[in-house]
Regions:
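Long, charged, low-complexity intrinsically disordered regions
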Residues: 1-125
């Protein structure tokens, strides 16, 4: 059996509008698959330091995590790379999904400019 290869992507400090509502999440998944990885772990935070908000009471994440999970479950374009039924939401602030096998990986690393530039200070979204 081959080694299980997992990419971990820390998305702390980003807003869903920068990752989920753009093509960044798609690029993360696609490039990870192109590397021949087996799984991608998206670290988005659990949103607990903001108190209990309506809609988050029975979840182990906040708004960002829910948006990521919604995209992974429902974006049909992502299904060419992921096994969406393998979505793992068991850890607080983290979402994992298994990738479909790639018999011929074409890249060795993620693009260095994959994530948008971090903005300092208050954002205007």
């Amino acid at each position: 059996m081959g080694m299980i290869k997992v990419i971990k992507m820390d998305l702390h400090g980003y807003h869903p509008s920068e990752i989920v509502q753009t093509d960044v999440l798609k690029k993360i998944i696609q490039q990870t698959w192109e590397m021949g990885e087996n799984c991608v772990t998206l670290i988005h935070g659990h949103g607990r330091n903001r108190g209990i908000s309506p809609g988050f009471v029975n979840t182990n994440t906040g708004y960002f995590g829910l948006e990521i999970r919604r995209a992974l479950r429902h974006d049909k374009e992502l299904r060419q790379w992921i096994s969406y039924t393998t979505l793992d939401c068991s850890d607080m602030g983290v979402t994992r999904v298994k990738l479909k096998p790639n018999p011929a990986p074409t890249r060795s690393e993620l693009d260095h400019d994959l994530l948008p530039e971090m903005k300092l200070g208050r954002r205007s979204w």
